[in-house]
């Protein structure tokens, strides 16, 4: 797509198309039938935090709880996570990684980093950092936007 074409697209449409393309690109690198890139992102988030509840995952990844719950159920079915009730609030479910998930993250993460590095190399480090800053600015604007 040329820059002129990009300027004629709305932000929502262009971001959704780009997101699908990037998701497919990362899926090629992962090359894993057991887990999607979205589920891998969840595993990495839980890995970084030790354990999280569904609300924390949804808030951090800016996803609705239904989508998070659906993916968590798939991850549990594949043996990647364990779910326990919170000691202080029985309504909350605490999500933790299993040894199988730690192994999966260790296996996929280098491929994930390679995929990201190739994108950064393609557009250049300076443009890539600027792109990430713009995305963060848009996210912040939308998160706090009130009509």
Name each model feature, range by range:
Residues 1-7, 125-147:
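C-terminal regulatory/oligomerization modules of transcriptional regulators
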Residues 21, 25, 41-44, 103:
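Pre-recognition alpha-helix immediately N-terminal to the DNA-recognition helix
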Residues 38-40, 66:
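Key DNA-contact positions within bacterial/archaeal DNA-binding proteins
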Residues 73-133:
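Charged, amphipathic alpha-helical coiled-coil/dimerization segments
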């Amino acid at each position: 797509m040329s820059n002129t074409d990009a300027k004629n697209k709305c932000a929502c449409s262009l971001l959704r198309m780009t997101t699908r393309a990037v998701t497919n690109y990362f899926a090629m690198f992962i090359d894993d039938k057991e887990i999607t890139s979205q589920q891998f992102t969840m595993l990495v988030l839980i890995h970084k935090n030790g354990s999280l509840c569904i609300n924390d995952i949804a808030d951090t990844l800016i996803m609705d709880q239904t989508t998070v719950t659906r993916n968590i159920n798939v991850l549990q079915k594949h043996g990647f996570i364990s779910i326990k009730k919170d000691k202080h609030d029985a309504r909350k479910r605490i999500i933790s990684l299993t040894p199988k998930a730690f192994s999966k993250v260790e296996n996929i993460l280098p491929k994930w980093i390679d995929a990201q590095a190739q994108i950064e190399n393609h557009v250049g480090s300076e443009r890539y950092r600027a792109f990430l800053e713009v995305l963060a600015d848009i996210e912040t604007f939308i998160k706090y936007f009130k009509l």
